[in-house]
């Protein structure tokens, strides 16, 4: 969709690199440099941005990179691609790392930082693990449950979009940029030990309630823009206050 006119530029069907249909979750999507990135579980897929020119068509994934932490949302900031998992208590084993902050609160959402590198294939620094290219994690943020989307403001503040359930109000949180401070500790992810910061009450700046089923978020031109899943065909008849609009948040 053209951001200025509001008109649709094209609709794209995504194919795997072998030409078969891509049927993954596509929990997160972001564009940076030469590529559009999307996630599905433990894999990050990349598509050349140039493939999206010329209107509606099929586009093919160029390659994939394995992730050490499952990813349901992604964003880009300060030279890193940040990807995190979705955790809710009803999914007992849906996490890779469990850590406690200084107050004893448990965190099972981990937002991992992977270094962007235009010189590398796929634009991400990787190592060769088990014959598969795996993204190298450099740092991590421990975040609250139910994160559906994340975005960084220009000053580094972190906006988290959190929701779960068709009849439960979603929450939007704004945290101060943690990496300008000394890390809160370290965390082991695979074979690496990386610095860890908590997005907890010590760093929260603002919070607000929003309609149910908030999903991805992006920051542009001074505002956060949040999309919702409630008006999707699958949910619109049963969700509370379904909305088919993109909502703007002026922090």
Predicted regions and their residues:
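Loop/turn-rich, solvent-exposed surfaces of beta-rich toroidal or solenoidal domains
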Residues: 138-207, 213-215
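Beta-propeller blade signature
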Residues: 1-5, 47-60, 96-122, 169-193, ...
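Blade-level signature of beta-propeller repeat domains, shared across WD40, Kelch, NHL, RCC1
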Residues: 214-251
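Residue-level detector of Asp-centered blade-edge/turn motifs that repeat once per structural unit
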Residues: 31-33, 76-78, 152-155, 219-221
């Amino acid at each position: 969709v053209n951001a200025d006119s509001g008109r649709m530029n094209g609709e794209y069907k995504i194919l795997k690199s072998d030409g078969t249909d891509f049927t993954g979750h596509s929990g997160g999507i972001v564009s940076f440099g030469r590529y559009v990135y999307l996630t599905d579980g433990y894999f990050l897929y990349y598509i050349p941005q140039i493939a999206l020119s010329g209107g509606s068509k099929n586009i093919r994934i160029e390659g994939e990179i394995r992730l050490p932490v499952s990813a349901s949302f992604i964003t880009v900031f300060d030279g890193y691609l940040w990807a995190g998992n979705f955790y809710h208590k009803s999914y007992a084993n849906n996490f890779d790392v469990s850590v406690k902050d200084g107050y004893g609160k448990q965190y099972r959402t981990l937002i991992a930082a992977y270094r962007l590198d235009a010189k590398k294939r796929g634009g991400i620094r990787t190592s060769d693990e088990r014959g598969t290219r795996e993204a190298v994690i450099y740092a991590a943020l421990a975040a609250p449950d139910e994160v559906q989307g994340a975005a960084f403001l220009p000053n580094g503040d972190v906006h988290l979009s959190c929701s779960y359930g068709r009849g439960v109000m979603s929450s939007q949180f704004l945290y101060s940029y943690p990496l300008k401070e000394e890390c809160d500790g370290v965390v082991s992810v695979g074979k690496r030990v990386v610095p860890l910061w908590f997005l907890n009450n010590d760093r929260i700046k603002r919070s607000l309630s929003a309609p149910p089923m908030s999903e991805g978020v992006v920051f542009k031109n001074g505002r956060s823009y949040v999309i919702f899943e409630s008006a999707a065909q699958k949910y619109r008849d049963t969700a509370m206050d379904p909305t088919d609009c993109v909502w703007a948040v002026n922090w």
